[in-house]
Amino acid sequence: MTKFTTEEVRSKFITYFKANNHTHVPTSSLIPHNDPSLMFVNSGMVQFKNVFTGQEKRPYNKAVTSQKSLRAGGKHNDLENVGYTARHHTFFEMLGNFSFGDYFKEQAIYYAWNLLTKEFELPKDKLYATIYHTDDEAASYWKKIAGFGDDRIIKIKTNDNFWSMGDTGPCGPCSEIFYDHGEQIYGGLPGTKDEDGDRFIEIWNMVFMQYEQIDKDTSIELSQKSIDTGMGLERMTAVLQHVNNNYNIDLFQEIINFTENIVKVKVEGEAKFSYRVIADHLRASSFLIADGVIPSNEGRGYVLRRIMRRSMRHAHMLGAKEPLMYKLLPKLVDLMGNVYPELKRAERFISSILEQEEIRFKATLERGLKLLTEETEMLTKGNELSGEVAFKLYDTYGFPLDLTEDILKTRDISVDHKGFEEQMLMQKERARKSWLGSGESKTDQLWFDIKEQHGSTEFLGYTLNEAKCKIIALIKNNNLVNDIKEIDTQFLLISNQTPFYGESGGQIGDIGTIFAKDSEVEVIDTLKYLGSIIVHKCILKKGQINVGENANFSIDIRYRQNLRIHHSATHILHAVLHEVLGKHVTQKGSLVAPTYLRFDISHSKAVTNEEITLIEDKVNEIIRDNHEVNTTFMATEDAVKQGAMALFGEKYDSEVRVVKMGETSLELCAGTHVRRTGDIGCFKITSESAIAAGVRRIEAVCGEFVIKLMREKDSLLKSIESSLKTNKNELITKVNNILERNKEVEKELEKTHLASLDLSIEQIEKQAAQITGIKLLYKKVGNIDNKILRQAAENLTKKVEDLIMVYIAEGIGKLSITVAVSKAITDKYNADIIAKKLSLFLGGSGGGGQASLAQAGGNDIGKLTNIHKKLYSLLTVS
């Protein structure tokens, strides 16, 4: 049996099916574009889901893919098992061949058997097949094609061998192919008590979609039967490299050996598990970041953070003192960058995110581990860590719950999940949003039906501002209607063609007017559904509008021109950011509005004022050069080869529109643009800020809006000059003088306030109340700065060794509490506790401080009348 590399296995699989007239479909992003209920793509069929359900048509009926997939949870792939078992992974590649109404069971089994035994040269006596127990048809094909006897065809009664999308929809029996690693390895055939052993390993699963589930008890035969298969690349490579553990294949071993050379710890004992975790999680983290996911505390970003922090903890276990993961990235890019060029394109950004996250986590990792050690010292095997401690590790030290569980796993200590969740609910500001699906299946089906009946909307707006179009559908309150009669009714309108641009690619939709006979419709927005249906959001202004009639569609030309200007400027900005900030910059989001543009980029630090000036200068230089803007349609592959920028994770058709601006910018884009860069006029950045870790937001204006901005600033400047009775040449000096004078006045005011609050020892003795052997002095004051109240209270408690000083300052709708306690009595009376209790009494949420000095707030001014009583009760029980 020939030994194949991972790359050769992938290549041979794809080449084999291409030779058998399958279309090679590139992998989709890990972020599913067609299933809002799914967090990540976890199998090869996800990108074809709408094809299988009949909601989408493709120009091919047979396909082959090598699909990036990710599983980071669930009963079959718990994160805690990754690295410790032979075949659990977060990121993996799923090889698959698919038929959409073309071939079925016999041909699928033939393709699989022929590839395994002839192309991959697997011994026939090492292979077994499982079938669903009632699928006699599949059994007959296995006997005919492979020559299997009944002893090699295993009938399975459970749903492991019957697949469905849900309670309704396409479904069908499965047939799995198992490989026998040999009797020297423990394990039994599928369906036996020893089936969980490692001897017999599933290497290929074929789903025969032949039924449609109508309801719980009813299924019918499909008129168009389909095939969905999946072969895990890592599993298959392990078989072909004669190893029984996926982590021993060439791809993982290269990463593990590279890591070993850096950390200088041998790959043996417990360390080998850490090396495997790091190798697996490096792939998952890097591909997620390349597809646009940023570590955060919710949704996909939180899954990424969990994976990253688990790998970082294992790097810590190997003794890595400095960030490690980003140092391993070049090796991964070297191994997989040719097959997945998004890794190469995003390498600098991935490296930056990996390093930053590790630096951020290292700051708290050791302290969190120390707390965990202290809290579990008295726990023994079978005990449970409290949910409160687990939550503190999560909230304060950044330990995801499954990381805490992973650490305690070796000691057989569990975590109180219920207690953890209770703590999570109590701290709402730390709660993460749950991942929710759209819940709009009825509405989704409406749009699929429209697309099925009428097809895509033809967009005319690249060359026309107005056109005669046929109205093919009207929608009101999510229902199709034949006409709209009520004036000022809001509704959706679909036509066979339109000059209106539907919001997509960051560019918002057009507005304008539709005229039909005696009717007039105002278009207040234009949207795009299912990628190709252009939907006009309308208000009826006059007459009646009907399905089937022709109408004149006219866009607001000035509105469109301003959109063109800002969209073209966005392309130029993108190119200049690459030049000024670096090639790692990728687009994370954008908004093209008629009055401004917003552009989100991957960049790990703030853009400096100097860089902003340089960016503005370069963009304006390109505008002044008045480059011609050309658009062409070409194959996606050709466009990318020519250097056209594409968005990671974005789904493109086989043919794309490429927008070229001189030699400056080349991007895939379906938006509307100016004819020459000079049409933009001018460009000005208005703000730059952070919106997430590693993501910066730039906002800018162009053309007439730059002039408007300059006029507003000029008007503001003149108002300031008038108010300060100066001119712009003397303005800075005048402002600095005012600021200096203000500082002096503030200092004088501070001295005055402190003097007014100061008391002699005799005055304290006279004014203070005697309570349980100590003195209590309470004063209500006006809206005085907290800093002054702190200083005044501290000064008084230094003069008298048994004093509790309480100030309550009343501001506009709020109260400020200051409590100071003489240090000689802090063993009995704690300023922090007193301040917090007063705060809660006065409607606040508690404050903070030390035993001798603390401050807090409140807002229930009405309760001040009872403050004396509250103070007395607090001190008599202290």
UniProtKB/Swiss-Prot annotation:
GO annotation, biological process = alanyl-tRNA aminoacylation; negative regulation of DNA-templated transcription
Q: Does the keyword Lipid metabolism apply?
A: no
Q: Does the keyword Oxidoreductase apply?
A: no
Q: What superkingdom heads the lineage?
A: Bacteria
Q: What does the record give as the reaction this protein catalyses? A: tRNA(Ala) + L-alanine + ATP = L-alanyl-tRNA(Ala) + AMP + diphosphate
What are the binding positions for Zn(2+) in this chain? 567, 571, 669, 673
Q: What role does it play?
A: Catalyzes the attachment of alanine to tRNA(Ala) in a two-step reaction: alanine is first activated by ATP to form Ala-AMP and then transferred to the acceptor end of tRNA(Ala). Also edits incorrectly charged Ser-tRNA(Ala) and Gly-tRNA(Ala) via its editing domain.
Q: What is this protein called?
A: Alanine--tRNA ligase
Protein source organism: Rickettsia massiliae (strain Mtu5)
Q: What is the lineage of its organism?
A: Bacteria, Pseudomonadati, Pseudomonadota, Alphaproteobacteria, Rickettsiales
